[in-house]
Amino acid sequence: GSIVGGGLKDLRIASIKAVDEAGVSGYRLSGIPSNLDDQEFSRIINEITPKLEEEKLRYLPAALSFDQMIGAVLAGVDLIDSNLAAKKAANGIALVNQGATVLHLDRQHFNFDSQVLDRQCACATCRAGYSRALLHSLITNHSFYGEQLLLQHNLFTLNKLMGGLRQAIKNHQTKKFVQELLQNQ
């Protein structure tokens, strides 16, 4: 069932109660405004999740930033549907260092940069050796191919990040994982 109420705590609590009474098998955390800053998003998510039954699936249909994705997982969200990788790629931005750092490939200083996006990355874009300079050229010339290469890289990066976070949670190393991630920002 859908949890609604936006930033209004009383409405969200009433919504949670109604969903629980309906006996559904999971929660859809909807009604969270898309224009929230990370701090307000975190406040709302951290108010909602402790009130949800633990054995039920928790689905977030939209996380718009890197920090929101991490915060949602740490708050107990099980499934996130995010367009972060695509939005960044469409704007010429590559996610590197497990997504903690961004490269704005439309900027001129990438014009002659022969490095791949991320030497530590095993995505098809990086393995094929596409340089930052080539990607810069494709992006600044509005090539759809450049956006596709960035999307492929960004999806791989975020999937690897979530896999690492999942493993850290499983091994009770979440705090250490997040600290290392934040040091890379």
Predicted regions and their residues:
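Glycine-rich phosphate/ribose-binding loops and adjacent secondary-structure elements
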Residues: 1-118
